[in-house]
Every structure is written in C-alpha cells, then in structure tokens.
Amino acid sequence: MTDTAPKAPVVDIPAITALVEPEVKALGLELVRIAMFGGKSDPTLQIMAERPDTRQIGLTECEALSRRLSEIFDEQDPIEDAYRLEVSSPGIDRPLTRRKDYQDWKGFSARIRLSAPLDGRKQFDGEIIGIDDADNVILDCPKVGQKILPFSAIERSKLLLTDALIAATQPLDSEGADQIVREG
C-alpha cells in the first residue's frame, strides 16, 4: 500500500535557520526547533523559541517574533508554496533538539526515537542521565537499564509529561490566556 497523503512542501531548513536565528537572538531568545509539517493543503512552518533564563516564552514575544519573521519571509520568500507560520514555546513536554537540552533536563523522563534500531529497537523511554563528552545521550530505561544513544542517531526526542515535570515547570504568568481562541 502506498501513502497517497499529500506531503508538506520540502524546505531548506538550514536556509530558514539562517534567516530565523538572527531575529530570535535579537529578541534575546534561543531557537529550539524549526519544523515543517502538515499536508500539501495545510503546510505549517513551526518555529519554537524560548528565553534562555526561563526556558519559556510569553505571548508578547511570540507575537513580536512572528511579525519580524513574517516581514523577512515576505521579503526573502524562502518557501515557494503557501504555508502557515506558527511561532510558539516548546511547551511542557518539549522536544529535545540540542545537546544542552539533555544536560538541562537531566533527571526527567524522555522518549527518544532513533533513525536506526539499536539492540533491536528504535524507541527508548527513560530518565535522562545526561550527555557525555563523546556526544552520547545516556538514558536510564526501566527493565533494560542504562542506554547510550549517539546524539547523531536521534530522529526525534521529547520530554514525557510526568508529575515531576509538572512540579518543576511553572508558567511565567498567564499573560494572554484570556485571548486564547480554540479552532474547530
């Protein structure tokens, strides 16, 4: 059976990053992730950013970054097809995309998916021990013990929502919460 679902446009993520990163830094933020997802009928370019000191971002900062990026993308036109721009915080069950994330979130539970199987499996859930000098993420997995996962082999990774994570992650404030509109 072939997958006939329309795919999101293929984009040059390094070229997009080169446009986005200076704007993110100009606002005192750090870039967490750039991703393109959705089908051909509703492609979305997602930009995740955060304040380095709090690992969060407020609604006002998301709006400011979105405006700056919209202007640049309108001028540079880095994506041929129509798409939607989404600027957001990484959220509580955030993706782990940078080496420093594995140090910053050590002691918390994560799900890591590898691009190729290791010991017969591609997905590992466990507590983050950290990242070593050889660029390996160390994860303590229930039932299988410690796993050493090469950072370069990670396809995607995210924190798992646990009581410990909820207790450790407090929102900065509720600014803009009354402006949230649910679609659908």
Swiss-Prot record:
Membrane among keywords: no
GO CC annotations, alphabetized: cytosol
Principal location listed in the UniProt entry: cytoplasm
Domain of life: Bacteria
UniProt keyword Lipid biosynthesis present: no
Gene3D superfamilies in the record: RimP-like superfamily, N-terminal
Disulphide connectivity of cysteines: none
Keywords from the UniProt entry: Cytoplasm, Ribosome biogenesis
GO BP of this protein: ribosomal small subunit assembly; translation
Compartments (UniProt record): Cytoplasm
UniProt xrefs under InterPro entries: Ribosome_maturation_RimP (IPR003728), RimP_C (IPR028998), RimP_C_sf (IPR036847), RimP_N (IPR028989), RimP_N_sf (IPR035956)
Family: Belongs to the RimP family.
The protein's role, per its UniProt record: Required for maturation of 30S ribosomal subunits.
Protein name in the entry: Ribosome maturation factor RimP
Organism per entry: Zymomonas mobilis subsp. mobilis (strain ATCC 31821 / ZM4 / CP4)
